[in-house]
Amino acid sequence: MEKIYNPKHIEESLYFFWEKNGFFKPNHLEKSTFCIMMPPPNITGSLHMGHAFQQTIMDILIRYHRMQGKNTFWQVGTDHAGIATQILVERQIFEKEQKTKKDYSRDDFIKKIWEWKKQSSNIITKQMRRLGISVDWDYEKFTLDPDISNSVREAFIILYKNNLIYQKKKLVHWDSKLETVISDLEVEHRLIKGKKWFIRYPIIENDMSLRSKVKYLIVSTTRPETLLGDTAIAVNPEDYKYNQFIGNHVSCPLTNRIIPIIKDRYADLEKGTGCVKITPAHDFNDYKVGLHHKLPMINIFTFDGRIKSTAEVYNYKGEKSNQYSTCIPMQFQHLDILSARIEIIKEITKLGFLEKIEECNVTVPYSERSGVIIEPMLTNQWYLKTSTLAKVALNAVKDKKIKFIPQQYESMYSSWMNNIEDWCISRQLWWGHRIPVWYDDQKNIYIGQNEKEIRQAYSISENVLLKQENDVLDTWFSSGLWTFSSLGWPKKTTFLKTFHPTNVLVSGFDIIFFWIARMIMLTMYFMKDKHNNPEVPFKNIYITGLIRDEFGKKMSKSKGNVIDPLDMIDGISLSELIKKRTNNLLQPNLSDKIIQRTIKQFPEGIKSTGTDALRFTFSALASSTRDIQWDMNRLKGYRNFCNKLWNASRFVLINTQDHNFSKFDVKRKMLLINKWILIEFNNTVKLYRESLDTYRFDIAANILYDFIWNIFCDWYLEFVKIVIKLGSSKEVYCTKNVLVYVLELLLKLAHPIMPFITETIWQRIKLIQNISEKTIMLQDFPEYNHKLFDKKILVQMNWMKKIIVFLRNIRTNMNVSSTKLLPLFLYNINSEQEKVIKENISLIKNISFLDKITILSEKYDKDLCIKEIIDGAEIIIPILKLVDTKVELKRLVKEQKKTELNIFKIKTKILNKDFLSYAPTKIVTQEKNKLLKLNEINLKLSEQIKIFRNMSYKK
């Protein structure tokens, strides 16, 4: 095995070896199964940290269950990501050709996207392979594959025929740049400085004496441009000021439209004037008021965000109405919305309708996709009824058929589902699943897989022109079918029968409603068990936290804090990293700031750590918290951990390569250290498996780290070196046998988290053990053996270790070189302890650099000594002749002064209110931890100074 651990030399070739030999494939169909559906990443770019994190977690689970002999299947695929992909390709086409989507036919534009998709998918799959994910690539799916598209159309048809899908004109969030409806959850609400305009609405009523007293109702609004679509003024029924006006009418400024004054509790007595203009076609709250009072709805905006030349008037049911005129003043026609606002303010000021203007803060909705202001728009869309579906999905979680891990996310899920509204499933895009609806000239609706099927089913002749619906389905609709459409539904395939329902979904809390809830609803509607009961899509939902930067900030390109997982695996120079972070910025003015931040954070670029170190870091950070702060120092530390395992394995291989250890009997007679390591490993297996079984990957990583670094390397290997050097031939052979046996099991234990390094080492170990199988990933995972537990062995070994630690501390604290051999005296030891000393005397002497070990029958009072009671036994080290007390005392006093100065500095800092108020929480915590450590050091220094002063006094 190579002397230096170099992950680059082993990882890519090893993945090719795994894939070529079909080790990732599901097999043994008669065995128990374990299946995960990978949340398909969007094809819009490369994998980010969140993808790498979640895919690592999923791969750990798949490898773990595969090694338990289960028939594992991990569905891999990518999502067509309708809006995001169309935006990206439109932008690229404009940059290259100065053309827009409208310069192409629909088919030609879609061809452009397919060309781009091939390029993007190759990047994503390459990244996945570098992460080591063990998926069967022969079953890779794309959400626009023909079989998936067939499933999506079939689902739509069934839902429509069962009266769960309908078409209706409703108010939606409209993106005027993309010219499509977007989800409520894709709207970002920003608080900005704005204005409130107070506008006079002339009162129209028969009582002229009343009119002479009050001529206007004054209404405040932050959107004066929408007054062109007003259909009522609302006042609160408890507002006595306006009771006399309820049932009367006002004239709408600029349009002279006569609209009613209505009573509704939506009008807030404490806000504005108490009067609210109601524009049902352009405000969500107004829309609800309009439905309640059966008000007309007047649409005044075009889909691209301009004032229409002719208004559209509908009744509250969304049907065309002639209740009001469709005329819009000519001077406002075709203006964009903000320009129209300016012109309308000018006109109402000129005509005397403006009362006053006030500065205020306004919450404005923006599209997360395009960045433009969202307009509430009255449009004809397709909807899925959700109330019945949601009830079944809610009960599945309540009845524990589906469990959230951590459990805290159940309440988030329940809250959303209890307040769910019908789902708008149509989008005004070209890229996506085109809705399987056709219309004839009379606007009759026909539903089917394709036009040919429809003509046959409805007996429509070729002479009748049929036109397909232009809209596509919301991306989340096809994604909601993912757990069963990817397995072949509606066909009853072997894979569908074998792997559904799946075992666990690994996802983020940010898409619990977007995707997870909808998946549960749709799956339980379409999938039924043998008793015709709704089948859940998965039994467990493991929700990961969100990966943030070291300061707790969300990673984004605009902040310049994004890290590509592959850049940590393979390394990247500073210049390349800067280029990557500043390329294609939406806000180029941020470039200098991002460059400076990058230089400060990574002055030498990012060094290669390899995949296993990255995967181990992800595992160690996978706690149950909502936010996870990325820590490059931990990544570096786990790179060192991989190196530690590599070097330890080299030591084992170098010392055992000439042997054949095909059999091992744990019951054979052996040294205490060998019995102990077997028990420790057995306990580690128990705790490790419990952690993986309960999705505590962070605990599993810490257990593995502690065993490899502290128990196996720092203790056991140090003992083994002495046995190999000084032990009898039987002791040496047995110890080497145990060494190989434990390492081979340890590699299997670590394999799910660290697949590359463990496979590489195992390929060497298997030769020594005469193992014929090709790969570690198909080996049996270590199991806990309760018969191996022996408390007596642990007590004996722990006592011996405590003595060794005590001796090491004396050398460290008193600055005694290892070349100076110490005498050790023991007093008041029991028979078991005496047995441990006698049987392991050579080990203890050599590991602690002792010249002799003496068991006393009487107390030791001859020389100045350090004594320690360890498990009832008195451990004695004479120290009078070990060191120059004056020199050592001087050194200790100097060290203490330095420590006390540092304590003073940190205390001053953490008592400073400004520091506590403005410093990041992480920095404050670090300073407090430093203080605790310095106080511990200072206490030890005081104890040592006291000892040496006593020694000087006795001399």
Curated annotation (Swiss-Prot):
GO terms for molecular function: aminoacyl-tRNA deacylase activity; ATP binding; valine-tRNA ligase activity. Keywords: Aminoacyl-tRNA synthetase, ATP-binding, Coiled coil, Cytoplasm, Ligase, Nucleotide-binding, Protein biosynthesis. The keyword Plastid does not apply. It comes from the Bacteria. One of its GO terms (cellular component) is cytosol. Its main location: cytoplasm. The keyword Ligase applies. Pfam families: Anticodon_1 (PF08264), tRNA-synt_1 (PF00133). It is found in: Cytoplasm. ATP binds at residue 557. Its EC number is 6.1.1.9. Catalyzes the attachment of valine to tRNA(Val). As ValRS can inadvertently accommodate and process structurally similar amino acids such as threonine, to avoid such errors, it has a 'posttransfer' editing activity that hydrolyzes mischarged Thr-tRNA(Val) in a tRNA-dependent manner. Belongs to the class-I aminoacyl-tRNA synthetase family. ValS type 1 subfamily. ValRS has two distinct active sites: one for aminoacylation and one for editing. The misactivated threonine is translocated from the active site to the editing site. This is Valine--tRNA ligase. It comes from Buchnera aphidicola subsp. Acyrthosiphon pisum (strain APS). The lineage of its organism: Bacteria, Pseudomonadati, Pseudomonadota, Gammaproteobacteria, Enterobacterales.
